[in-house]
Curated annotation (Swiss-Prot):
InterPro entries recorded: 23SrRNA_methyltr_KL, DNA_methylase_N6_adenine_CS, RlmKL-like_Mtase, RlmL_1st, SAM-dep_methyl-trfase, SAM-dependent_MTases_sf, THUMP_dom
Functional note: Specifically methylates the guanine in position 2445 (m2G2445) and the guanine in position 2069 (m7G2069) of 23S rRNA.
Main location per the UniProt record: cytoplasm
Catalytic activity: guanosine(2445) in 23S rRNA + S-adenosyl-L-methionine = N(2)-methylguanosine(2445) in 23S rRNA + S-adenosyl-L-homocysteine + H(+); guanosine(2069) in 23S rRNA + S-adenosyl-L-methionine = N(2)-methylguanosine(2069) in 23S rRNA + S-adenosyl-L-homocysteine + H(+)
GO molecular function: 23S rRNA (guanine(2445)-N(2))-methyltransferase activity; RNA binding; rRNA (guanine-N7-)-methyltransferase activity
Family: Belongs to the methyltransferase superfamily. RlmKL family.
Gene designation per UniProt: rlmL
Record's protein name: Ribosomal RNA large subunit methyltransferase K/L
Entry's Gene Ontology cellular component terms: cytoplasm
Residue ranges annotated for the THUMP domain, each copy included: 44-155
Xref: NCBIfam families: PRK11783.1 (NF008748)
């Protein structure tokens, strides 16, 4: 008898214990987080390699000992007679799990164990074994816990979840042992004659594992690589006998009581290919289908077991929330009497189903902490859920806003405007409409609001927006707006490069709703742009910190003699050129790539009208110094005054909260100061009123 250590994913410990006791009835088990340990025979270890649907590794323990520091670890490893385990011609790898105060990373621990093994051969005058990381002849396993280490031979060689039947996968494949655990926790494995359906099958893992279970196919039967094949302790005759037994107990085809579907034809094709390679193609009925419109394939209720998308990436929520909402409604309409089991790392998405779970289980899918939620679609759970948007606080406020704005929207001559701006403290978002699109900007919640609550509120917003506005969920862009610092204020957050055309007061503009935090058009400056247009007739106009040039467009449309557009970003200057071209404005136009804070101080040109809308703060690498609008605005206006013609005008604006114009210093420059903030705040931003401040400064 020898100590055998079996590992699995967190959350599967109890299931693994039951499985080990089924395969090795006499085992006296010691259970730990993600591990099972017992005294067993080589036959027990081989059975687990071949038959365990839940284990990752089966370790034949060689020794356990002190590992309080690197020297102790080395000595414990040196205490093993490695010449009894492997030949010097064999390749090896060391997998090291755990850290302690002295051994701070697993790579260092693995190297010390490897050094001990190699040195043990060298001391005997034998050649040094070489390292092979992918498919070594001998895979050594080391597990460190506090100051003790367990060392052994990994009989699996590679994780047992790799059944060797998956030829292709999707973007987020489900591990095979997790699929088996889902089937066990769902209750289906106790009633395998019942129909089983996976409505989001991906590469087919759940359905294939179900077919293996129904037909009593050993999960390791197709594996060709094992960690024991070259091990000197391997008993080939015993292993071959177990393989023969496994083949003899396989059941014939289960007759197609397993169903797998996916919205993607490509994934259905991949699932079919994997099932064919696994030898269970005829046991599974495949179909391309939309889960939100699905119906049971048979009249007899059974089990739905699926691994839906989790929404780990922020932008996915806009499509997943309505998907889960529709899916929940479909379950209630069409799947009465069925058992449903869904795995997710996002409990809030599961709540969108509006189903009451009877049980849920923790299990890690890779590094993601997930829950398997079990539902019974009985009478209590299938009462039709129809959430009236008018009865929801956010939806009710949004409807109220849209009703109040209806007349203004008709006369505003634009298809870009704000419809909600954190009107309710619990729903801390801004919602802007751009034609047939909505942009949702989630403000970072205050520290007094928990992340869970903020996430739940955001999901409610995304759920109700399509119903109230009539905008498709696919046309909702989601962004998180926290306080931006330095160069991050214009950083890319996506790479789509997709532009759409919008209009405002007779002008057309290109916006990008997904790639940046801002879209390319500051909606709160709609009135300010009209002010510039009204003052531009026959004037030489300078637009500083020009962004995408919308002010330059209106200056030209207002009859400006010339327009000079200055920005530090070539990307935004190119965008500005496109906006000017889109409106067929002939110029003359000058586009200058420069740091406005230094360019203005050395520029010799003179202008009738200067528009300045700087960032609150910047420390871009392209700038010689940092910029702070509160600290530096007088210097900026001093330089601007030097470029201003007699009887010229500066329009100065910024968005810094709490900003205070140094009127004394500005007046001393010979400029008359007029605060025009109130008239530059558009109707759709009037509820807040503090989106920006704006002044006219006249010489």
């Amino acid at each position: 008898m020898n100590t055998i250590l079996v590992t699995t994913s967190r959350g599967l410990d109890e299931l693994l214990k039951q499985e080990v006791l089924t395969l090795c009835p006499d085992a006296q088990i010691k259970q730990g987080p993600g591990t099972i340990q017992f005294e067993g025979s080589k036959e027990d270890a081989y059975k687990l390699c071949l038959w365990s649907r839940l284990a990752n590794r089966v370790i034949w323990v060689l020794a356990s000992g002190k590992a309080g520091d690197a020297e102790a670890l080395y000595n414990t490893a040196m205490g093993i007679d490695w010449q009894m385990q492997m030949d010097s011609r064999h390749t090896l790898s060391v997998q090291f799990i755990g850290t302690n105060f002295a051994i701070k990373n697993t790579q260092f621990g693995a190297v010390r164990v490897k050094d001990a093994i190699v040195d043990s051969f060298v001391e005997q005058g034998l050649p040094r074994p070489s390292v092979e990381r992918k498919t070594p002849d001998i895979s050594v396993y080391a597990r460190l816990h506090r100051d003790n280490v367990i060392l052994g031979i990994d009989l699996a060689g590679a994780s047992l979840h790799q059944r060797a039947y998956r030829q292709e996968t999707g973007d987020a494949p489900l591990k095979e042992h997790i699929a088996s655990a889902m089937l066990m926790r769902s209750g289906w494995t106790e009633n395998t004659d019942a129909p089983l359906v996976d409505l989001m099958c991906g590469s087919g893992t759940i359905a294939i594992e179900a077919a293996y279970i129904a037909r009593n196919i050993a999960p390791g039967i197709k594996r060709s690589y094992w960690g024991f094949t070259k091990w000197l302790g391997h008993e080939a005759t015993l292993w071959d006998s177990l393989l023969e037994d496994a083949i003899s107990v396989q059941k014939p085809s289960c007759g197609g009581g397993i169903y797998a579907g996916d919205f993607s034809r490509k994934m259905v094709a991949i699932a079919k290919a994997n099932a064919d390679f696994a030898g269970v193609f005829n046991d599974i009925s495949f179909s391309q289908q939309d889960a939100t419109k699905s119906s049971p394939p048979v009249a007899t209720p059974g089990y739905v077991v699926s691994n839906p998308p989790y929404g780990e990436r922020l932008g996915e929520l806009t499509s997943l929330i309505p998907l889960f909402s529709d899916w929940g409604k479909r379950f209630k309409e069409a799947w009465k009497g069925w058992h449903v089991s869904l795995l997710s790392s996002n409990r809030d998405l599961l709540r969108v189903l509006k189903l009451r779970a009877t049980k849920d289980y923790a299990m890690n899918n890779g590094k993601l902490e997930c829950r398997l939620a079990n539902y019974v679609l009985d009478e209590q759970n299938t009462v039709q859920f129809s959430e009236d948007a008018g009865n929801h606080e956010f939806a009710n406020r949004l409807k109220k806003n849209l009703k109040r704005m209806k007349g203004w929207v008709k006369s505003a001559n634009t298809n870009c405007y704000r419809i909600y701006d954190a009107d309710l403290p619990d729903y801390n978002v801004a919602v802007d409409r751009y034609g047939d699109w909505l942009v949702v900007q989630e403000y970072a919640p205050p520290k007094t609001v928990s992340e869970d609550k903020a996430r739940k509120r955001l999901q409610e917003v995304l759920l109700h927006l399509p119903a109230v506005t009539g905008v498709s969920p696919k046309n909702i862009a989601l962004k998180v707006r926290a306080q931006q610092k330095g160069s991050k204020q214009y950083e890319k957050i996506n790479q789509s490069g997709e532009m759409m055309e919008v209009f405002e007061n007779g002008a057309r503009f290109l916006v990008n709703l997904t790639d940046y935090l801002d879209t390319g058009l500051f909606l709160d400056h709609r009135n300010t742009r009209q002010k510039v247009k009204a003052l531009s007739q026959g004037k030489d106009v300078l637009n500083l910190f020009s962004y995408t040039g919308s002010v330059s467009v209106f200056a030209a449309m207002g009859g400006a003699k010339s327009v000079t557009t200055v920005d530090m970003s070539n990307t935004y200057l190119d965008w500005a050129k496109k906006n000017v071209a889109l409106n067929k404005l002939s110029g003359p136009h000058a586009f200058i790539q420069a740091d406005c804070t230094t360019w203005l101080g050395t520029h010799k040109g003179k202008y009738d009208l200067i528009f300045i809308d700087p960032p609150s703060f910047s420390n871009s690498k392209r700038m010689q110094n940092t910029w702070d609008v509160q600290r530096d605005h007088v210097k900026m206006l001093t330089d601007a005054k030097a470029c201003l013609k007699e009887q010229g005008t500066i329009i100065f604006s910024n968005n810094k909260r709490g900003f205070k114009l140094d009127e004394t210093a500005v007046t001393a420059l010979g400029l008359q100061v007029e605060n025009i903030t109130k008239e530059t705040i558009p109707e759709d931003f009037a509820r807040k009123g503090k989106i920006h401040q704006c002044w006219v400064l006249r010489s």
